[in-house]
Amino acid sequence: MGLALQHSHRWDLSPREAANLQTRLRPLVLAEDALPDEIRTVAGVDVGFEDHGRITRAAVAVLDFPSLRPSDQAIVRRPTRFPYVPGLLSFRELPALLEALERLNLLPGLILVDGHGYAHPRRFGIACHLGVLTGIPTIGVGKTRLVGTHGELAEDRGSWIPLIDGDETVGAVVRTRRGVQPVYVSVGHRLSLPTAVDWVLRCTPRYRLPETTRQAHRLASA
């Protein structure tokens, strides 16, 4: 199924130009619920690197919802064109991920991104970037904290507390499984933070990470 981008831009940018573009695109993020009436598929995206970082390997894993059974996948390899710069992950990874999405038979109703969304120094992480370009609802699910501070989180599965940066709530610290480290959830595009947390928990029935992320990581690192 063809991927019709809602917005597009050049990718051959310097790190300074890329950071400025994030600031310009940030107002396009919709941090309120605008999901499809029914979500039948959810996807995870992840990226690995081959040949000492010279090749980007992007993977998309699509799962039926609510069964979370794999239904489609795509893997793309292409030369890495952008350096590793903290906070500019999307410029290194998104060109290959967009190509992988283009190869799917059917676009997913929701994408969980292995990375951050609004919980980002310029409030425009890779989950926001992907959502704004494609128009698909997206959630950032980070394994580590990029910005912000938080209080003590209860041990029970489903517990969550705000992630605060300055005077702003930028995400949520979420316990997806009792006795394991939390994940850092943030809005990507077209949903609110409570809804993002709810969907992450729905997609994380057994392990610390969502099943979408686990399947995409398996493809990206195989």
Curated annotation (Swiss-Prot):
Reaction(s) the record says it catalyses = Endonucleolytic cleavage at apurinic or apyrimidinic sites to products with a 5'-phosphate
Recorded GO cellular component terms are: cytoplasm
InterPro entries with a match to the protein in the record:
Endonuclease-V
Q: GO molecular-function annotation terms?
A: deoxyribonuclease V activity; magnesium ion binding; RNA endonuclease activity, producing 5'-phosphomonoesters; single-stranded RNA binding
UniProt-annotated site: Interaction with target DNA, residues: 84
Where mainly found? cytoplasm
NCBIfam families found in the cross-reference section = PRK11617.1
What's the protein here called?
Endonuclease V
Species of the source: Methylococcus capsulatus (strain ATCC 33009 / NCIMB 11132 / Bath)
What is the gene name? Answer: nfi
